[in-house]
Structures are given as structure tokens and as C-alpha cells.
């Protein structure tokens, strides 16, 4: 099953376990957020929204908040000793799609457990 969602003025085709970089949204790292603007639900019988599919949403886990690459806007007017250089970086949220929900259901999956780091003793330590 897939869905086409709209967030931040852009549309994304998603399936469960997709990792997605979108414009910054509210939510702490590790929490589940719901994206409610579902335009299309695909599968055995596709459902097209007019403009959105009623009762459908997509649940996603917030993996990270970060800043995107620097975009430089440089303007130069030749032979005029005039130039302007500006740059900016977008705020980005990285999401993992956990579930595609139809008919007003709520997410059943909580945040994934974090893997514990196993620290092995270095050679020579431990047998004195």
C-alpha cells in the first residue's frame, strides 16, 4: 500500500519504512507524528481524494531535526563594482513512515526501541 501526502507545499509518494526529508515540523525526536493531508491511497483499489481522502492519515516517527545544505544567492552586476552574496540553510525534519492509516484509525506502533551499544573490554583489561 502507498500514499501520496502533501506537507510544506510539496507532495511525496510514501510506503511504510520510507525515510523522508521534509520541511521542519513540530515534534520531538522519537515521537510519532500524523500527516493528515493524504491525496491518494494506493493498493488493490486506489482511492483518490477530492482534494484529500477523508479519514486517512500517515503516521511517521521523527528521526532527526537538522539543517539542509547551504544555498547561495549571488548577484553580480558586471562593470559596476556591485555584487551581493547571501546564503541560507533550510530547517529539515527526517521522518520514517511507520503506517498508512485509513478510515480514521490511530497509529498502533510506538517509537522503535533504540539499539543498546555493547562495549567490549579491550584486550589486556579484565585479567590482572
Swiss-Prot record:
Residue ranges, annotated region (Disordered): 104-128
Keyword Ribosomal protein: yes
Cysteine pairings via disulfide bonds: none
Keyword annotations: Ribonucleoprotein, Ribosomal protein, RNA-binding, rRNA-binding
Bias type Basic and acidic residues, positions: 116-128
InterPro entries linked to this entry: bL21-like, bL21-like_sf, Ribosomal_bL21
GO terms of molecular function: rRNA binding; structural constituent of ribosome
Single GO biological process annotation from the record: translation
One CC-aspect GO term: cytoplasm
Lineage: superkingdom: Bacteria
Protein purpose: This protein binds to 23S rRNA in the presence of protein L20.
PANTHER family referenced in this protein's UniProt entry, alphabetically: 50S RIBOSOMAL PROTEIN L21 (PTHR21349), LARGE RIBOSOMAL SUBUNIT PROTEIN BL21M (PTHR21349:SF0)
Homology family: Belongs to the bacterial ribosomal protein bL21 family.
Assembly mode: Part of the 50S ribosomal subunit. Contacts protein L20.
Protein name: Large ribosomal subunit protein bL21
Originating species: Nitrobacter hamburgensis (strain DSM 10229 / NCIMB 13809 / X14)
Amino acid at each position: 500500500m502507498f500514499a501520496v501526502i502533501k506537507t510544506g507545499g510539496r507532495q511525496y509518494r510514501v510506503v511504510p519504512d520510507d525515510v523522508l526529508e521534509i520541511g521542519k515540523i513540530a515534534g520531538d525526536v522519537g515521537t510519532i507524528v500524523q500527516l493528515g493531508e493524504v491525496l491518494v491511497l494506493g493498493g488493490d483499489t486506489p482511492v483518490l481524494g477530492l482534494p484529500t481522502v477523508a479519514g486517512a492519515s500517515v503516521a511517521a516517527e521523527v528521526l532527526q531535526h537538522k539543517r539542509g545544505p547551504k544555498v547561495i544567492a549571488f548577484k553580480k552586476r558586471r562593470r559596476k563594482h556591485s555584487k551581493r552574496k547571501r546564503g541560507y540553510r533550510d530547517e529539515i525534519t527526517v521522518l520514517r513512515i511507520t503506517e498508512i492509516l485509513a478510515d480514521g484509525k490511530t497509529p498502533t506502533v510506538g517509537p522503535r526501541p533504540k539499539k543498546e551499544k555493547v562495549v567490549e573490554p579491550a584486550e589486556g583489561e579484565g585479567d590482572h
